[in-house]
Amino acid sequence: MAKESSFDIVSKVELPEVQNAIQTALKEIGTRYDFKGSKSSITLEGDELVLVSDDEFKMNQLKDVLVGKLIKRNVPTKNIEYSKLENASGGTVRQRGKLVQGIDKENAKKINNLIKKSGLKVKSQVQDDQVRVTGKNKDDLQQIIAMVREADLPIDVQFINFR
């Protein structure tokens, strides 16, 4: 009997890469003319980004710079959920961005349904914050990977533990 192959579908954000992106974004903000004298800053508190700027316009520019740096470092920007803008001290505005780690139940169900609708001979099961896909044919598994990549999911997914 053929050995079963498997892989895991996960959704992770590499925190060291986020920290590096923040450092390069802060460096760029320090040299940009439109940020001269601005109280703009970006910090990482646990798994949450905290952006502080003078006003809403500068906040949007700050986010654009940060997103550009995150993309260069291959950090999925889909996995950042921003809160509403709030007033901070000193006439500044603050916005928090939560870094989503893992696949929640709702998205795991979407992935499971997508795999079941494919009609391929594979099994999928939800394990905590990841989805494991097993099957005898490696070609079927590769088709599942391609299909999940093409799917319009609200989170970014990675594929690990190929066996």
UniProtKB/Swiss-Prot annotation:
Keywords: Nucleotide-binding. One of its GO terms (cellular component) is cytosol. PANTHER family: UPF0234 PROTEIN YAJQ. It holds the Pfam family DUF520. This is Nucleotide-binding protein BLi01194. InterPro entries: DUF520 (IPR007551), UPF0234-like_C (IPR035571), UPF0234_N (IPR035570), YajQ-like_sf (IPR036183). Belongs to the YajQ family. GO terms for molecular function: nucleotide binding. It comes from Bacillus licheniformis (strain ATCC 14580 / DSM 13 / JCM 2505 / CCUG 7422 / NBRC 12200 / NCIMB 9375 / NCTC 10341 / NRRL NRS-1264 / Gibson 46).
